[in-house]
Amino acid sequence: MLSTSSNCSLEEVAEAATGPLWFQLYHRGKALTEMLVRRAEDAGFKAIVLTIDTPVPSPKERDLRNRFERSLELGNFRDLNLPRNEISGTDETPGWDVSRADPITWNDLEWLRSLSSLP
């Protein structure tokens, strides 16, 4: 399963993969969510897994202990012709701050399902 926050893009992983592809989608507002779903479909992904329980990424003890640093870019947001603050709500690395998207509702789920026939 490939995360929205992967360092590699959907397309890069699809090109290298030998097995079934699932995409873990973090809701990023309608425009970015739709773009990600379309790209997943076009790249040959077979399922969308929506994650809604991560409103704010937490500092994980193991990451702090191992001095993990966030990457400078996330593959799925590379080469977008949008200002960083339109992608993440801040001037931080695009895609890291999932808390900036509007909370997802049942209507949003219905809308998301209408975008694709993928399970």
Predicted regions and their residues:
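Active-site entrance/lid segments in N-terminal catalytic domains of soluble metabolic enzymes
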Residues: 1-119
